[in-house]
Amino acid sequence: MVEKRVQPLARDAMAYVLAGGRGSRLKELTDRRAKPAVYFGGKARIIDFALSNALNSGIRRIGVATQYKAHSLIRHMQRGWNFFRPERNESFDILPASQRVSETQWYEGTADAVYQNIDIIEDYGVEYMVILAGDHVYKMDYEWMLQQHVDSGADVTIGCLEVPRMEAVGFGVMHVNEKDEIIAFVEKPADPPPIPDKPDFALASMGIYVFHTKFLLDALRRDAADPNSSRDFGKDIIPYIVKNGKAVAHRFAKSCVRSDFEHEPYWRDVGTIDAYWQANIDLTAIVPELDIYDKSWPIWTYAEITPPAKFVHDDEDRRGSATSSVVSGDCIISGASLNNSLLFTGVRANSFSKLEGAVILPNVKIGRRAQLKNVVIDHGVVIPEGLVVGEDPKLDAKRFRRTESGICLITQPMIDKLDI
Protein backbone atom coordinates (compact mmCIF):
# COMPACT_ATOMS: atom_id res chain seq x y z
CA MET A 1 0.00 0.00 0.00
CA VAL A 2 1.31 3.48 -0.89
CA GLU A 3 2.31 5.56 2.12
CA LYS A 4 0.26 8.61 3.00
CA ARG A 5 1.53 12.09 2.22
CA VAL A 6 3.28 14.05 4.96
CA GLN A 7 0.54 16.69 4.79
CA PRO A 8 -2.81 14.84 4.91
CA LEU A 9 -5.31 15.89 2.27
CA ALA A 10 -8.07 15.49 4.87
CA ARG A 11 -6.89 18.73 6.48
CA ASP A 12 -8.11 20.58 3.39
CA ALA A 13 -11.39 18.66 3.07
CA MET A 14 -14.96 19.01 4.26
CA ALA A 15 -17.16 16.02 5.04
CA TYR A 16 -20.76 16.61 4.04
CA VAL A 17 -23.08 14.02 5.56
CA LEU A 18 -26.50 13.37 4.04
CA ALA A 19 -28.72 12.51 7.00
CA GLY A 20 -32.23 13.45 5.93
CA GLY A 21 -33.62 10.05 4.99
CA ARG A 22 -36.41 8.26 6.80
CA GLY A 23 -35.36 4.65 6.23
CA SER A 24 -38.93 3.42 5.71
CA ARG A 25 -37.86 -0.25 5.53
CA LEU A 26 -37.07 -0.06 9.24
CA LYS A 27 -40.82 0.37 9.75
CA GLU A 28 -41.80 1.58 13.22
CA LEU A 29 -38.18 2.13 14.28
CA THR A 30 -38.21 5.30 12.19
CA ASP A 31 -41.70 6.51 13.07
CA ARG A 32 -40.19 8.99 15.53
CA ARG A 33 -36.64 9.42 14.24
CA ALA A 34 -34.64 9.57 11.02
CA LYS A 35 -32.66 6.46 10.10
CA PRO A 36 -29.28 8.06 10.94
CA ALA A 37 -30.59 8.68 14.48
CA VAL A 38 -31.51 5.03 15.09
CA TYR A 39 -29.61 3.49 18.00
CA PHE A 40 -26.77 1.09 17.24
CA GLY A 41 -24.19 -0.99 19.06
CA GLY A 42 -25.14 -0.41 22.69
CA LYS A 43 -24.60 3.35 22.98
CA ALA A 44 -24.13 4.99 19.56
CA ARG A 45 -26.39 6.16 16.74
CA ILE A 46 -25.95 5.04 13.14
CA ILE A 47 -24.70 8.47 12.06
CA ASP A 48 -21.81 8.26 14.52
CA PHE A 49 -19.97 5.89 12.17
CA ALA A 50 -19.76 8.33 9.26
CA LEU A 51 -18.94 11.20 11.61
CA SER A 52 -16.30 9.20 13.49
CA ASN A 53 -14.71 8.06 10.24
CA ALA A 54 -14.41 11.68 9.16
CA LEU A 55 -12.93 12.79 12.48
CA ASN A 56 -10.53 9.85 12.73
CA SER A 57 -9.45 10.43 9.11
CA GLY A 58 -8.31 13.94 10.03
CA ILE A 59 -11.25 15.90 8.62
CA ARG A 60 -12.06 18.81 10.91
CA ARG A 61 -14.84 20.53 8.96
CA ILE A 62 -18.14 18.69 8.88
CA GLY A 63 -21.65 19.60 7.74
CA VAL A 64 -24.73 17.43 8.30
CA ALA A 65 -27.86 17.93 6.18
CA THR A 66 -31.04 16.89 8.01
CA GLN A 67 -34.69 16.79 7.03
CA TYR A 68 -37.05 13.96 8.09
CA LYS A 69 -38.04 14.05 11.81
CA ALA A 70 -34.68 15.54 12.70
CA HIS A 71 -35.22 16.51 16.36
CA SER A 72 -33.74 13.34 17.85
CA LEU A 73 -30.79 13.47 15.45
CA ILE A 74 -30.08 17.16 16.03
CA ARG A 75 -30.28 16.76 19.82
CA HIS A 76 -27.86 13.84 19.67
CA MET A 77 -25.33 15.81 17.60
CA GLN A 78 -25.65 18.89 19.81
CA ARG A 79 -24.84 16.75 22.84
CA GLY A 80 -22.21 14.44 21.37
CA TRP A 81 -20.51 16.47 18.64
CA ASN A 82 -20.09 19.88 20.25
CA PHE A 83 -16.31 19.68 20.80
CA PHE A 84 -15.14 21.27 17.53
CA ARG A 85 -13.26 24.56 18.04
CA PRO A 86 -13.31 27.40 15.47
CA GLU A 87 -10.03 28.76 16.83
CA ARG A 88 -8.40 25.51 15.64
CA ASN A 89 -10.00 25.88 12.20
CA GLU A 90 -12.61 23.25 13.10
CA SER A 91 -16.35 23.43 12.50
CA PHE A 92 -19.43 21.26 12.82
CA ASP A 93 -22.58 22.61 11.16
CA ILE A 94 -26.06 21.12 11.31
CA LEU A 95 -27.90 22.07 8.12
CA PRO A 96 -31.67 21.46 8.33
CA ALA A 97 -33.75 21.90 5.20
CA SER A 98 -34.49 25.61 5.55
CA GLN A 99 -35.55 26.77 2.09
CA ARG A 100 -32.33 28.73 1.60
CA VAL A 101 -32.64 28.73 -2.22
CA SER A 102 -36.42 28.86 -2.57
CA GLU A 103 -38.99 29.88 -0.01
CA THR A 104 -41.14 26.88 -0.90
CA GLN A 105 -38.49 24.23 -1.56
CA TRP A 106 -37.20 21.54 0.82
CA TYR A 107 -34.37 19.20 -0.11
CA GLU A 108 -35.59 17.42 -3.24
CA GLY A 109 -32.77 14.88 -3.49
CA THR A 110 -29.26 14.09 -2.31
CA ALA A 111 -27.63 16.54 -4.73
CA ASP A 112 -30.14 19.27 -3.85
CA ALA A 113 -29.29 18.81 -0.16
CA VAL A 114 -25.76 19.95 -1.03
CA TYR A 115 -26.74 22.56 -3.63
CA GLN A 116 -28.99 24.45 -1.22
CA ASN A 117 -25.98 25.03 1.06
CA ILE A 118 -23.48 26.09 -1.60
CA ASP A 119 -22.86 29.44 0.11
CA ILE A 120 -21.88 27.67 3.33
CA ILE A 121 -19.55 25.31 1.46
CA GLU A 122 -17.88 28.24 -0.31
CA ASP A 123 -17.32 29.93 3.05
CA TYR A 124 -15.34 26.88 4.21
CA GLY A 125 -12.83 27.46 1.41
CA VAL A 126 -11.74 23.80 1.28
CA GLU A 127 -10.07 22.10 -1.68
CA TYR A 128 -11.95 18.79 -1.43
CA MET A 129 -15.47 17.60 -0.62
CA VAL A 130 -16.22 14.17 0.81
CA ILE A 131 -19.94 13.38 0.40
CA LEU A 132 -21.16 10.71 2.83
CA ALA A 133 -24.35 8.84 3.61
CA GLY A 134 -25.23 9.10 7.29
CA ASP A 135 -27.01 5.76 7.55
CA HIS A 136 -24.36 3.05 7.04
CA VAL A 137 -22.26 1.11 9.55
CA TYR A 138 -18.57 0.74 8.69
CA LYS A 139 -15.06 1.98 9.56
CA MET A 140 -13.10 3.71 6.81
CA ASP A 141 -10.08 6.01 6.52
CA TYR A 142 -11.15 8.62 3.95
CA GLU A 143 -7.56 9.85 3.58
CA TRP A 144 -6.74 6.87 1.33
CA MET A 145 -9.69 7.72 -0.90
CA LEU A 146 -8.66 11.38 -1.07
CA GLN A 147 -5.15 10.38 -2.09
CA GLN A 148 -6.42 8.12 -4.87
CA HIS A 149 -8.67 10.93 -6.08
CA VAL A 150 -5.75 13.36 -6.40
CA ASP A 151 -3.28 10.83 -7.82
CA SER A 152 -5.72 9.62 -10.50
CA GLY A 153 -6.78 13.10 -11.63
CA ALA A 154 -10.43 12.06 -11.37
CA ASP A 155 -13.39 14.42 -11.47
CA VAL A 156 -15.13 12.17 -8.95
CA THR A 157 -13.95 9.17 -6.96
CA ILE A 158 -16.66 6.77 -5.80
CA GLY A 159 -16.36 4.42 -2.84
CA CYS A 160 -17.24 0.89 -3.95
CA LEU A 161 -17.81 -2.53 -2.40
CA GLU A 162 -16.81 -5.78 -4.01
CA VAL A 163 -19.96 -7.92 -3.80
CA PRO A 164 -20.95 -11.21 -5.45
CA ARG A 165 -22.49 -10.36 -8.82
CA MET A 166 -25.93 -11.76 -8.09
CA GLU A 167 -26.09 -9.80 -4.81
CA ALA A 168 -25.34 -6.56 -6.65
CA VAL A 169 -28.76 -6.35 -8.32
CA GLY A 170 -30.02 -4.03 -5.56
CA PHE A 171 -27.13 -1.55 -5.86
CA GLY A 172 -25.83 1.05 -8.23
CA VAL A 173 -23.06 -0.87 -9.99
CA MET A 174 -19.84 0.42 -11.57
CA HIS A 175 -18.61 -1.02 -14.85
CA VAL A 176 -14.84 -0.42 -14.67
CA ASN A 177 -11.74 -1.07 -16.76
CA GLU A 178 -8.42 -2.52 -15.55
CA LYS A 179 -7.47 0.86 -14.00
CA ASP A 180 -10.76 1.07 -12.05
CA GLU A 181 -11.88 3.93 -14.26
CA ILE A 182 -15.67 3.86 -14.47
CA ILE A 183 -16.97 3.16 -17.97
CA ALA A 184 -20.64 3.03 -17.04
CA PHE A 185 -22.86 3.38 -13.99
CA VAL A 186 -25.87 1.05 -13.91
CA GLU A 187 -28.65 1.42 -11.32
CA LYS A 188 -29.90 -1.97 -9.99
CA PRO A 189 -28.95 -4.02 -13.07
CA ALA A 190 -30.45 -7.45 -13.76
CA ASP A 191 -27.03 -8.61 -15.01
CA PRO A 192 -24.36 -6.67 -13.07
CA PRO A 193 -21.12 -6.03 -14.99
CA PRO A 194 -18.20 -8.01 -13.47
CA ILE A 195 -14.93 -6.66 -12.10
CA PRO A 196 -12.20 -7.27 -14.71
CA ASP A 197 -9.90 -9.11 -12.28
CA LYS A 198 -12.76 -10.81 -10.35
CA PRO A 199 -15.41 -12.02 -12.81
CA ASP A 200 -17.68 -13.40 -10.07
CA PHE A 201 -17.88 -10.02 -8.33
CA ALA A 202 -19.25 -6.56 -9.10
CA LEU A 203 -18.40 -3.10 -7.76
CA ALA A 204 -21.37 -1.61 -5.90
CA SER A 205 -21.58 2.05 -4.93
CA MET A 206 -21.32 2.85 -1.20
CA GLY A 207 -22.79 6.33 -1.68
CA ILE A 208 -19.42 7.92 -0.85
CA TYR A 209 -18.05 10.52 -3.27
CA VAL A 210 -14.89 12.66 -3.35
CA PHE A 211 -14.71 15.81 -5.49
CA HIS A 212 -12.56 18.85 -5.89
CA THR A 213 -14.85 21.49 -4.41
CA LYS A 214 -14.94 23.77 -7.45
CA PHE A 215 -15.81 20.88 -9.76
CA LEU A 216 -18.63 19.75 -7.45
CA LEU A 217 -20.18 23.21 -7.13
CA ASP A 218 -20.10 23.71 -10.91
CA ALA A 219 -21.75 20.30 -11.37
CA LEU A 220 -24.45 21.14 -8.82
CA ARG A 221 -25.24 24.47 -10.48
CA ARG A 222 -25.49 22.80 -13.88
CA ASP A 223 -27.77 20.12 -12.47
CA ALA A 224 -29.98 22.68 -10.71
CA ALA A 225 -30.55 24.41 -14.05
CA ASP A 226 -31.79 21.17 -15.64
CA PRO A 227 -35.61 21.00 -15.33
CA ASN A 228 -35.53 17.24 -16.00
CA SER A 229 -33.12 16.41 -13.18
CA SER A 230 -34.27 14.57 -10.05
CA ARG A 231 -31.50 16.38 -8.09
CA ASP A 232 -29.85 13.12 -7.05
CA PHE A 233 -26.19 12.08 -7.05
CA GLY A 234 -26.81 8.49 -8.07
CA LYS A 235 -29.41 9.26 -10.73
CA ASP A 236 -28.09 12.53 -12.19
CA ILE A 237 -24.71 13.87 -11.05
CA ILE A 238 -22.68 10.65 -11.22
CA PRO A 239 -24.06 9.36 -14.58
CA TYR A 240 -23.34 12.78 -16.13
CA ILE A 241 -19.72 12.72 -14.95
CA VAL A 242 -19.22 9.11 -16.04
CA LYS A 243 -20.42 10.08 -19.53
CA ASN A 244 -18.67 13.44 -19.85
CA GLY A 245 -15.72 13.37 -17.43
CA LYS A 246 -13.47 11.04 -15.49
CA ALA A 247 -14.89 8.89 -12.69
CA VAL A 248 -12.76 6.43 -10.73
CA ALA A 249 -13.76 3.63 -8.35
CA HIS A 250 -12.14 3.39 -4.92
CA ARG A 251 -12.29 -0.13 -3.52
CA PHE A 252 -13.35 -0.19 0.13
CA ALA A 253 -10.81 -2.92 0.93
CA LYS A 254 -8.03 -0.34 0.45
CA SER A 255 -9.30 1.97 3.20
CA CYS A 256 -11.41 -0.22 5.49
CA VAL A 257 -10.20 0.01 9.10
CA ARG A 258 -9.86 -3.53 10.45
CA SER A 259 -8.27 -5.04 13.55
CA ASP A 260 -8.05 -8.46 11.87
CA PHE A 261 -7.25 -8.58 8.17
CA GLU A 262 -8.54 -12.14 7.96
CA HIS A 263 -12.01 -10.60 8.16
CA GLU A 264 -13.72 -9.29 5.06
CA PRO A 265 -14.21 -5.49 4.94
CA TYR A 266 -17.31 -4.77 7.04
CA TRP A 267 -19.99 -2.45 5.65
CA ARG A 268 -23.70 -2.72 6.39
CA ASP A 269 -26.70 -0.72 5.20
CA VAL A 270 -28.85 -1.83 8.20
CA GLY A 271 -31.82 -0.61 6.18
CA THR A 272 -34.16 -3.46 7.10
CA ILE A 273 -35.21 -4.92 10.45
CA ASP A 274 -33.35 -8.15 9.64
CA ALA A 275 -30.15 -6.33 8.66
CA TYR A 276 -30.37 -4.04 11.71
CA TRP A 277 -30.86 -6.98 14.08
CA GLN A 278 -28.03 -8.97 12.50
CA ALA A 279 -25.52 -6.09 12.55
CA ASN A 280 -26.16 -5.53 16.26
CA ILE A 281 -25.97 -9.25 17.05
CA ASP A 282 -22.70 -9.42 15.06
CA LEU A 283 -21.12 -7.39 17.88
CA THR A 284 -21.67 -10.23 20.37
CA ALA A 285 -19.16 -12.49 18.55
CA ILE A 286 -15.90 -13.33 20.33
CA VAL A 287 -14.00 -11.44 17.64
CA PRO A 288 -16.60 -9.30 15.85
CA GLU A 289 -15.95 -8.30 12.24
CA LEU A 290 -16.76 -4.71 13.27
CA ASP A 291 -14.40 -3.92 16.13
CA ILE A 292 -15.97 -1.23 18.30
CA TYR A 293 -13.30 -1.84 20.96
CA ASP A 294 -10.45 -0.55 18.76
CA LYS A 295 -9.11 2.50 20.62
CA SER A 296 -7.07 3.59 17.60
CA TRP A 297 -10.30 4.20 15.64
CA PRO A 298 -13.00 4.99 18.22
CA ILE A 299 -16.67 5.47 17.45
CA TRP A 300 -17.34 8.87 18.97
CA THR A 301 -20.80 9.51 20.38
CA TYR A 302 -22.69 11.25 23.17
CA ALA A 303 -21.07 9.97 26.37
CA GLU A 304 -24.10 9.59 28.60
CA ILE A 305 -23.17 9.43 32.28
CA THR A 306 -24.48 6.14 33.66
CA PRO A 307 -23.70 3.84 36.58
CA PRO A 308 -22.21 0.42 35.76
CA ALA A 309 -24.33 -2.54 34.73
CA LYS A 310 -25.36 -4.82 37.59
CA PHE A 311 -26.24 -8.53 37.82
CA VAL A 312 -28.11 -9.74 40.91
CA HIS A 313 -29.49 -13.02 42.35
CA ASP A 314 -27.69 -16.35 42.26
CA ASP A 315 -30.34 -18.97 42.97
CA GLU A 316 -30.59 -22.12 40.87
CA ASP A 317 -33.57 -20.91 38.82
CA ARG A 318 -33.10 -17.18 39.39
CA ARG A 319 -29.61 -16.12 38.38
CA GLY A 320 -28.65 -12.81 36.82
CA SER A 321 -26.37 -13.88 33.97
CA ALA A 322 -25.23 -13.06 30.45
CA THR A 323 -23.29 -15.11 27.89
CA SER A 324 -22.05 -13.94 24.48
CA SER A 325 -23.81 -10.62 25.08
CA VAL A 326 -23.14 -6.88 25.16
CA VAL A 327 -24.63 -5.15 28.22
CA SER A 328 -24.41 -1.35 28.49
CA GLY A 329 -24.25 0.90 31.53
CA ASP A 330 -27.20 1.36 33.90
CA CYS A 331 -28.61 -2.07 33.04
CA ILE A 332 -29.83 -4.22 35.92
CA ILE A 333 -30.13 -7.94 35.20
CA SER A 334 -32.15 -9.06 38.20
CA GLY A 335 -32.41 -12.83 38.14
CA ALA A 336 -32.75 -12.87 34.34
CA SER A 337 -30.61 -14.74 31.81
CA LEU A 338 -29.28 -13.37 28.52
CA ASN A 339 -27.62 -15.14 25.63
CA ASN A 340 -26.38 -13.74 22.33
CA SER A 341 -28.07 -10.40 23.05
CA LEU A 342 -27.25 -6.69 23.01
CA LEU A 343 -28.68 -4.29 25.59
CA PHE A 344 -28.51 -0.50 25.40
CA THR A 345 -28.40 1.68 28.50
CA GLY A 346 -30.97 1.60 31.27
CA VAL A 347 -32.56 -1.79 30.56
CA ARG A 348 -34.22 -3.64 33.46
CA ALA A 349 -34.62 -7.41 33.05
CA ASN A 350 -36.57 -8.90 35.94
CA SER A 351 -36.49 -12.32 37.55
CA PHE A 352 -36.98 -15.54 35.58
CA SER A 353 -37.04 -13.73 32.23
CA LYS A 354 -34.96 -15.16 29.37
CA LEU A 355 -33.55 -13.28 26.39
CA GLU A 356 -32.06 -15.00 23.33
CA GLY A 357 -30.95 -13.05 20.27
CA ALA A 358 -32.46 -9.85 21.69
CA VAL A 359 -31.57 -6.28 20.66
CA ILE A 360 -32.99 -4.08 23.42
CA LEU A 361 -32.96 -0.30 22.98
CA PRO A 362 -32.58 2.10 25.94
CA ASN A 363 -34.83 2.22 29.00
CA VAL A 364 -36.79 -0.95 28.27
CA LYS A 365 -38.36 -2.79 31.23
CA ILE A 366 -38.81 -6.55 30.92
CA GLY A 367 -41.33 -8.14 33.26
CA ARG A 368 -40.88 -11.35 35.19
CA ARG A 369 -40.96 -14.66 33.30
CA ALA A 370 -40.92 -13.00 29.89
CA GLN A 371 -39.39 -15.22 27.18
CA LEU A 372 -38.02 -13.18 24.27
CA LYS A 373 -36.21 -14.70 21.28
CA ASN A 374 -34.96 -12.95 18.13
CA VAL A 375 -36.46 -9.55 18.89
CA VAL A 376 -35.76 -5.84 18.47
CA ILE A 377 -37.46 -3.86 21.25
CA ASP A 378 -37.84 -0.11 20.74
CA HIS A 379 -36.86 2.61 23.19
CA GLY A 380 -38.81 2.75 26.46
CA VAL A 381 -41.05 -0.28 25.90
CA VAL A 382 -42.50 -2.00 28.99
CA ILE A 383 -42.71 -5.76 28.40
CA PRO A 384 -45.50 -7.31 30.51
CA GLU A 385 -44.92 -10.27 32.81
CA GLY A 386 -44.99 -13.66 31.14
CA LEU A 387 -44.91 -12.40 27.53
CA VAL A 388 -43.57 -15.05 25.16
CA VAL A 389 -42.15 -14.04 21.77
CA GLY A 390 -40.35 -16.34 19.37
CA GLU A 391 -42.25 -19.58 19.95
CA ASP A 392 -45.45 -19.14 17.91
CA PRO A 393 -44.81 -17.49 14.49
CA LYS A 394 -48.50 -16.93 13.72
CA LEU A 395 -49.22 -15.31 17.07
CA ASP A 396 -46.07 -13.19 16.83
CA ALA A 397 -47.05 -11.97 13.35
CA LYS A 398 -50.51 -11.04 14.64
CA ARG A 399 -49.16 -9.07 17.58
CA PHE A 400 -45.92 -7.55 16.32
CA ARG A 401 -43.93 -6.66 13.20
CA ARG A 402 -42.47 -10.09 12.28
CA THR A 403 -40.10 -10.49 9.33
CA GLU A 404 -39.95 -13.53 7.05
CA SER A 405 -36.79 -14.67 8.81
CA GLY A 406 -38.53 -14.55 12.19
CA ILE A 407 -37.25 -11.31 13.75
CA CYS A 408 -39.94 -9.45 15.72
CA LEU A 409 -39.92 -5.68 16.15
CA ILE A 410 -41.81 -4.66 19.31
CA THR A 411 -42.96 -1.11 20.09
CA GLN A 412 -45.04 0.29 22.94
CA PRO A 413 -48.18 0.84 20.82
CA MET A 414 -48.04 -2.86 19.88
CA ILE A 415 -47.77 -3.81 23.55
CA ASP A 416 -50.67 -1.51 24.44
CA LYS A 417 -52.92 -3.40 22.01
CA LEU A 418 -52.24 -6.81 23.56
CA ASP A 419 -55.12 -8.62 25.23
CA ILE A 420 -53.21 -10.41 27.96
Curated annotation (Swiss-Prot):
GO molecular function, one term: ATP binding
Alphabetical keyword list: ATP-binding, Carbohydrate metabolism, Glycogen biosynthesis, Glycogen metabolism, Nucleotide-binding, Nucleotidyltransferase, Transferase
Keyword Ribosomal protein in annotation: no
Pfam families, sorted: Hexapep_GlmU (PF24894), NTP_transferase (PF00483)
Gene3D superfamilies assigned: Hexapeptide repeat proteins, Spore Coat Polysaccharide Biosynthesis Protein SpsA, Chain A
Reactions this protein catalyses: alpha-D-glucose 1-phosphate + ATP + H(+) = ADP-alpha-D-glucose + diphosphate
InterPro entries: ADP-Glc_PPase, ADP_Glu_pyroP_CS, GlgC_bac, GlmU/GlgC-like_hexapep, NTP_transferase_dom, Nucleotide-diphossugar_trans, Trimer_LpxA-like_sf
The EC number(s) this enzyme carries: 2.7.7.27
The UniProt record lists the keyword Nucleotidyltransferase: yes
Enzymatic class: transferase
Family, as annotated: Belongs to the bacterial/plant glucose-1-phosphate adenylyltransferase family.
UniProt-recorded name of the protein: Glucose-1-phosphate adenylyltransferase
Source organism: Rhizobium leguminosarum bv. trifolii (strain WSM2304)
